[in-house]
Amino acid sequence: GELAIVTGAIRDEGTSLHYIPADFPAVAHYEVVQALRKAATAKGLAHRVGISQSKDSFYGEVEPEHSGVTQRLLDRWKAWEIGGAICSEMEASTLFIVASMLRVRAGGIMVMHGEGELGSLEPLIETAVLAVRELIKGDQNA
């Protein structure tokens, strides 16, 4: 599927709240985002750059009709889409918050897919490795 390069994440989860209040944004480091974009473009891979929703419940998104708060989940996802969210996952916001607290760079790249098989993760892995190599090279030249 198409790659999602995440610039920031909606903090729709609880873990990151144990590090800093919810008012603090969960954002990727711009150098990591740039390196991921450059790598995906160099490999000729379809990709989108944007915001992700980080959530606590996998099945709340995949099967909201089996929840006691079905309409709330559907309404919230619709709001995130209207705001420009391109994907949903369960880790990025906490990763970005912890990276901010530790003053280290972090980014996120995911494979977007809907129904059916996910397919190979090789393009994602190769893109991430190429981006990390670019970051290392940039650090060595700085």
Language-model features: where?
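Accessory terminal and edge-of-domain segments that mediate assembly/interaction
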Residues: 1-142
